[in-house]
Amino acid sequence: MAKPWLNGEHRQNRENDAIVFLILILLAFLPYVNALSNTFVYDDRQQILENPYVHSFRYLGRIFGSTVWTFEGAQGITNYYRPLMTFAYLLAYKIFGLLPFGFHLMNLVLHAAVVLLVFAVTERLFHDRLISLIASGLFALHPIHTESVAWIAGVTDLELSFFFLLSFLLYLHLADTGRKTTRSWTSYILLVLSYSLSLLSKEQALVLPALAIVYEHLYRPGEAGSQFHDKWRRYLPLCLVAAAYIAFRRFALGGFAPAIWRPTMSWSGVVLNAIALIGSYLGKLVWPVHLTAFYVFHESRSVADPRVLAGLAGLIVCAGLFAWLWRTARPFSFALLWMGATLAPVLNARWMPAQVFAERYLYLPSIGFCWLIGWVVAKLWRGAREGSRPAALAFLRQAIAITVAFVACFYAIRTVERNRDWRDEEVLYRKTLEAQPDAQVIHTNLGVDYSERGDWANAEREWILALGPGTPSAVTLSNLGLVRMKQKRYSEAADLFDQAIRLRPSFVDPYKHLAEMYVEMGRLVDADNQFQHAVSLAPLDINLRNTYGHFLLQQGRASDAREQFARSAEADANAEAYDNLGDLDLAAGDTQRARADYQAALALNEIDNHADFGLAKLDEQQGRIADAVREYRAGLETDPRNAVALAAVQRLTGQTSQ
């Protein structure tokens, strides 16, 4: 039977834990509250708004069995594998619909959960609550994490870090330093499941087995005499899961890197640029200013490059710090290994895409940095409590407390400010171009934002700037072709579309724009050919299917049009496809199917006046006058000047009054 004072002590500890967790949750949440009102930006629109995989559970097999962009068809064939990201979007869509708030809330909750796991892992590793609190608090507030939290697509790093930390914590449970751990199958199953989810978040998780092996043989205290088989049994599950994942990526998906983006870069160049990147990442961790969403990559070609020299200096400092910590405070040298191992996968510029350097790549590695800062601050604080000069020590403690508070406030303010940069696409792209004026992809994206608002002059300006030096992108060429098409400069437009196709034959936009241009020019056979090519490249593109369906209707090809609208609805249920199917069924006299089509459209869009008017026509044909009037009036709420509907209401109400 437990003694009362032990129960009281246990209750006090639980209350203290609750207070600590509440503080950490507030530190994680409060700086990001203003991000909840941000919109979809950058890749969010394609990966959420235009992605049928996100809108239906029937694509679950494709989510986990294919790469991220395969919903785009041939142009989306890559080895970029992030199934847990798409699955998270699917769950958020089912809960919140297409409200950006829900997706931002998901990121915020995940960030808070990661902060709590940082605290738990730190305490398990170093057995020091003060260090754990400082490290996790610093991690919660660090502005370098804004991209991962404020940008919805940053969820990949949040998921990776959550399951990576959880897996490491479960591994530490198997390798408990204070006692012999009871190894149950449940523990191993949880470890395998958690690590599998980490790998399904991002391949960066492959470094976890290496970290576990190093920790097991070099850092875990208390069992120096342990048998080798006792040690390897703890990390063997991680190694087996990693091997299975590598085999799956290699044989089912074709590898890890989607392409060698810089095939001309030599391996000596890879090393030089990796050193330069290390210097840049260390600089952003220590002094997180001039943050931006996109950094233009400038290749380093010489050891004398200032960025390489800065990286070498950083490596020398880290090596010296590691050697000193190994001798004086060995457990904390593991923090440097954590940073190096988790950052290593993003240091190969030869394989990295256009954005070689990105702040979000620091989300997981920064934990090691936070451990070191936590250790330094805790050591200074405790040192300021011992000595023979109380007044001086009190002053030192006050100075430490003020410094910590100042840094925390500075970080929180910088985070709040950075959240505003992600508010919407125009703000994001303008802010990014202020910092990186030669970012061609950002000029392209800003031009798209202008074009969607009908500002074609500014769109053209941005796309011309996006051409820049070197080989232009197929996207930019296609967009400029669209401008020339709208200016009726068809020959120039066709030339730009052809250039885009030669650069990227699987890119669907130039085929679609060529089809639309040929329609304007009256070259209907050529238009039909381009439409057919486009839908073969992007079979799940509902907008393309619907556009092609309308074209076929105008040519009197109702049967072919029906097929396009049906495939559109099948790919991703949408009101436009069902509206057109309803019109076709109504014209064919199939009133039952027409009614089902219009009702399906209204289920997807309750203010779809086209469906309301279609149902009204059906009711009128079937003599259900009161229902017809009600449907016409429902449609008039969103289309109050529709002459046909107004006349129908007047006519039908006149009939009922008679």
Regions picked out by a protein language model, each given a short descriptive name:
Residues 2-488, 509, 513, 543:
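Polytopic membrane enzymes that build or remodel cell-surface glycoconjugates and lipids
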Residues 452, 486, 520-521, 554-555, ...:
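Register position in tetratricopeptide repeats
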Residues 435, 469, 503, 537, ...:
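Structural marker of alpha-solenoid helical repeat scaffolds
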